[in-house]
Amino acid sequence: MRLTKHIAALRSDRRGVAAIEFAIFASLISIGMLNVVDIAVYVYQRMQVEYATQAGAQAAWHTCDINHLPATTNCSGLNTAVTSAVQSTSLGTYVTLQSGSPSEGYYCVNGSNALQRVSDVSSKPTDCSGVGSPGLQPGDYISISTTFAYAPLFPGITVAGTFATPITRTALMRLG
């Protein structure tokens, strides 16, 4: 009989309900805020990798003039300039060049108005007939590819753990 009175008293007591509701909503809001922070950090770091890749391509263009093409074989300061530019963002040395980067080749615009690689720099084609544009001349492009190992701040709690990692980006720059 005593137990049933205690259970009935607990059912009618409302003093702790507000604290329980607050704890539930605070935890939901906290998880939401952790997601916002993690996603914002990911977007910022991805943006920095994109900027670093573009900076590397611009450094290649700035370092190697048209008289020293192809740049990968005739421009002695190319790798140093590109590496320095790629690591000039707030991410620093954590942004690295991918294996085989920088690479250079001849590109033409195909029928879909997209750049298409037609050959290495070792053998320059006479025109772009290989992609269906015989009236166009191929351009010398350098490709810079970078990578950054992203790690979420709150693994297992936020959706940022499902994002692509590492973050990789590629930039093309016409040299000649």
Q: Which residue stretches match the model-derived regions?
A:
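Alpha-helical assembly-interface signal, strongest on the long, hydrophobic N-terminal helix that forms
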Residues: 2-86
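Residues embedded in well-ordered secondary-structure elements
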Residues: 38, 133-135, 160
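Residue-level preference for short coil/turn positions at secondary-structure junctions
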Residues: 12, 138-140, 167
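A general secondary-structure boundary signal
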Residues: 46, 50, 54, 90-93, ...
